[in-house]
């Protein structure tokens, strides 16, 4: 089966993103296709490259990045939600006159069209 995941919780502070990541790994292990993960609302914090968890905690931001690098899973970040929460790529930082960007490599700012496309092309969309 082909899956897409929607993550609405931050990397730390709630269980949503961690559960989504574990579910994503289980899908791949079981032979399913995970086409994309769409981060919406507070979920955009999963793409903040400035996140620095304690040394004894799992680094969820880098975990998502590895999922992208190893399995080609698209990591789409809602651009409107990201900008409201201070998550910007180099293009948006330049456009807004900001000193730097903080979007973790492997993630892509995108619109709700990416979520709509995933909904149309996947067998299942699971929200966390």
From Swiss-Prot:
Entry superkingdom: Bacteria
Active site (record annotation): 78
Keywords, ordered alphabetically: Cytoplasm, Transferase, tRNA processing
Enzyme class: transferase
Subcellular location: Cytoplasm
GO BP terms in the entry: tRNA wobble position uridine thiolation
Gene Ontology molecular-function annotations: sulfur carrier activity; sulfurtransferase activity
EC number: 2.8.1.-
Assembly description: Heterohexamer, formed by a dimer of trimers. The hexameric TusBCD complex contains 2 copies each of TusB, TusC and TusD. The TusBCD complex interacts with TusE.
Family: Belongs to the DsrE/TusD family.
Known role: Part of a sulfur-relay system required for 2-thiolation of 5-methylaminomethyl-2-thiouridine (mnm(5)s(2)U) at tRNA wobble positions. Accepts sulfur from TusA and transfers it in turn to TusE.
PANTHER family: PROTEIN YCHN (PTHR34874), SULFURTRANSFERASE TUSD (PTHR34874:SF3)
Name of the featured protein: Sulfurtransferase TusD
Species this protein is from: Escherichia coli O139:H28 (strain E24377A / ETEC)
Species lineage: Bacteria, Pseudomonadati, Pseudomonadota, Gammaproteobacteria, Enterobacterales
């Amino acid at each position: 089966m082909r899956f897409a995941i929607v993550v609405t919780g931050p990397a730390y502070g709630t269980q949503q993103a961690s559960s989504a990541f574990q579910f994503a790994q289980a899908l791949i292990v079981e032979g399913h296709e995970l086409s994309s993960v769409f981060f919406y609302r507070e979920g955009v914090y999963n793409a903040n490259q400035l996140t620095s968890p304690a040394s004894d905690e799992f680094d969820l931001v880098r975990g998502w990045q590895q999922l992208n690098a190893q399995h080609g899973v698209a990591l789409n970040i809602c651009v409107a939600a990201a900008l409201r929460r201070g998550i910007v790529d180099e293009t948006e930082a330049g456009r807004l006159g900001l000193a730097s960007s903080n979007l973790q490599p492997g993630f892509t700012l995108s619109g709700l069209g990416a979520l709509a496309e995933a909904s149309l092309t996947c067998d299942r969309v699971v929200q966390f």
